[in-house]
Amino acid sequence: DDARDDESRAHLVEQLRAQSTPAQAISLCNELVRDRISYAAGSTTVSTTASEAWATGSGVCQDFTHAMLSLLRSAGIPARYVSGYLHTEEQALGETVRGESHAWVEVWNGGWEGLDPTNNRAVGSAHVLVARGRDYADVPPLKGIYAGGASQGLGVEVEITQLVR
């Protein structure tokens, strides 16, 4: 029910506004998103909205990011969408590992801070920033027109090599 979902999100926004500091509101927002959305690969598309992710309670990185952005902005906290890559393995210096396309949030708290709501952590050296924007539509990793068979798919493979520590 859309009305109930809107009422629930409005209640979450009020919880954020009730915090003493922006840092507390940002931390609470991350917790709220993690508590209400579960990671489910392939459960959504790039056109899935934050409202749809809230309603289904599942999504992928861009859904976690859009959900967090919608709450933060509704609470008056500036935030932006970040597109990039994430490598999830520790590797030796100079060793190449596979990375994954990924999305996370940057939020203004006296300076821009990166938060990864999908993995419930601060953005660090495992995150490789490619672009920033208002939402996914501003910074898709690939954009264009394809003409061909209807059954075609697209895959992304990323290799990351850390050169310095």
Please identify what each model-predicted range represents.
Residues E31, D63-Q152:
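Hydrophobic/aromatic-rich core segments of domains that either
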Residues D1-G59, A67, A75, Y136, ...:
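Secondary-structure boundary elements
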